[in-house]
Amino acid sequence: MSEQNHPQTEPQLDENQIIALRREKLHNIRQQRNAYPNDFKRDSFAADLHAQYGEIGKEELDPQGIPVKVAGRMMLKRQMGKASFATIQDVSGQIQLYLNNKGVSQEVLDDFNHWDLGDIVGAEGTLFKTNHGELTVRVSDIRLLSKSLRPLPDKHKGLSDQETKYRQRYVDLIANEESRNTFIKRSQIIQSVRNFMVGEHYLEVETPMMHPIPGGATAKPFVTHHNALDIPLYLRIAPELYLKRLVVGGLERVFEINRSFRNEGMSVRHNPEFTMIEFYEAFSDYERMMQMAEDIIRNASRTVNGTANITYNGKEVDLESPFERLTILEAIKKYNPHYTDEQLNDAEWLKKEIVKHGESLPPSPGIGSLQLALFEGCAEGKLWNPTFIIDYPVEVSPLARASDTKQGLTERFELFVVGRELANGYSELNDPEDQAERFKAQVAQKDAGDDEAMHYDADYIRAMEFGLPPTGGCGIGIDRLVMLLTDSQTIRDVILFPQMRPE
C-alpha cells in the first residue's frame, strides 16, 4: 500500500494464543450481531476496477465519486491516527480501502480496528486516487462477513513449507499469487482443450469410473467392492475400451476429460489420481492423432501464454515449429551415435546396456521390449523440444494396430516434451481376432508375474465383433500439460489436492 510502511502484524504470540485471542473476538461479535452475515452484495472485482479506472488521473477520477461495493480477504492493514488503510484480496487481485471518521462512524472505525488480517470484509464507498496515484475505495460502510480464526503466513516469508503447501492448499492459495495463477491457468487450459475438441466436431462423453475388469492401459488398479452386487470393482486406469465401444456404436468422434487412477508410485511426474483427455475418431489413423495432439498443445499454449514459444525450467521450448518424429531406434542413435544396428538387435547386449543405464529389465524379454527399455534409459530424458516417438513394438502395444509395412511394429506414437511423456496414441486395433490373441498374450504375461499386464475383456471383444471402423485414438496427460505450460516442476504444484501420506 502506498500510504503505509508496514502492515499490521499479530502480537508476539504463538499460534495457539493468537487463535484463542481471535476466538474471544468472535465471541464478542456474536454477542452483538450475526457474526457471519450473508446479505452483502458485491458489484465490483478488484481487477475490473483497476482495468477500468487505473489509468485515469486523480483530478479526473475523484470528482466523479464512482460508487462501488467490493469484498475480499484483508491482507494488509494500518491505522494512521483517525484514518486507516487496508488492502483486500478477491479472486481477481487486490484493492486498497481508506477509512476515516468523516466517511464512517466512530463505531464502525472501532470495529474495524479490532479486525484481523485474514478477516473477510465487504466495503461500500467511492473510488479516488491517493496522492501516490493508487486506486482506492473511500469507504462509507464496511462490514465483517467472516472472521478468520487462524493467522495467515507472514506476508514477506510466504508459505514456504512444501508439506503445508500441499496439505493446506487453501492457505497456499490465499498466500501465494503464483499458486492462484497456476490453477487459474489450469482451468483455462482445460477449457481451451475442450473448446478445441468441440471445434473439431467431437462429442464429449462420460464413461464409468468403476470397471468390472481393469483395462485400457498397462498399470496396477485400485480395487474396491460393491456390496449390493458382491463383486470386486476397479477404479479405472484408462477410459479407452469404453470410448471405443462408443465408436462401435456410431459415435464417430468422442472425447472425455476426466480422472484415472493407478495404484503405483508417486514422483514429480506421477500422482495416483490424475486427469487426462482421451479422444477417438473413426476413419482416422495415428497420423491424424499426432496432428491433433500437436494442435491441441500449441493452441492451449497460445491461449494461456499468448505464444507457443515458452520457457520451462529456464530453457526455451519450441511448441510452434512442427514436432519432430523419430522411431525408437532413431532416437537411441541420435543421442548415442556409437551404438550399432547389430548391438541394438542383440538381446544380451541390450540387457547389459539397460542395466548400465539404471533401468529395470522388462518382464517381456522380446527385442522390442528391450529396445524400448534402453530408449527410456538413454534417450527419453534428452527429448527437450516436442518429439513424437513412433512405430512401437507389438509386444508393448496390445491395443494398437499392427503396421502393414513394418513387421513386428505398430502404428503407435508417444509424445515427449522436456524429457517426459505427454501423450500416447495409435491407430486402433480393430481386428477382433487379433485383439483376442493379444489379450491372451497379456494374460500369459500376467500369469508369468507381470502385474501390469492387461486382463482379457470378453465384452470388449464382443463389441469389436460388431465392427470397429478404422479408428485413431490419443490420450494426453492434462496434469503434465499444465506443468509444461505453467513452468511447474512437480505434478503436486498443478493438482489442487495431491495425494499425501496421512498426517
Swiss-Prot record:
Sites where the protein binds Mg(2+) 2: E421
InterPro entries xrefs: Aa-tRNA-synt_II (IPR004364), aa-tRNA-synth_II (IPR006195), aa-tRNA-synth_II/BPL/LPL (IPR045864), Lys-tRNA-ligase_II (IPR002313), Lys-tRNA-ligase_II_N (IPR044136), Lys-tRNA-synth_II_C (IPR018149), NA-bd_OB-fold (IPR012340), NA-bd_OB_tRNA (IPR004365)
A Pfam family of this chain: tRNA_anti-codon
GO terms of molecular function: ATP binding; lysine-tRNA ligase activity; magnesium ion binding; tRNA binding
Top-level enzyme category: ligase
Protein biosynthesis recorded as keyword: yes
Binding-site residues for Mg(2+) 1, renumbered to this chain: E414, E421
CDD domains associated with the record: LysRS_core, LysRS_N
Annotated S-S bridges: none
Keywords: Aminoacyl-tRNA synthetase, ATP-binding, Cytoplasm, Ligase, Magnesium, Metal-binding, Nucleotide-binding, Protein biosynthesis
Names of required cofactors: Mg(2+)
An annotated GO cellular component: cytosol
Entry's localization field: Cytoplasm
GO terms (BP aspect): lysyl-tRNA aminoacylation
Reaction(s) the record says it catalyses: tRNA(Lys) + L-lysine + ATP = L-lysyl-tRNA(Lys) + AMP + diphosphate
Note describing how the cofactor binds: Binds 3 Mg(2+) ions per subunit.
E.C. code: 6.1.1.6
Xref: NCBIfam families: lysS_bact, PRK00484.1
Family membership: Belongs to the class-II aminoacyl-tRNA synthetase family.
Subunit structure, as described in the record: Homodimer.
Stated name of the protein: Lysine--tRNA ligase
Species of the source: Neisseria meningitidis serogroup C / serotype 2a (strain ATCC 700532 / DSM 15464 / FAM18)
Organism classification: Bacteria, Pseudomonadati, Pseudomonadota, Betaproteobacteria, Neisseriales
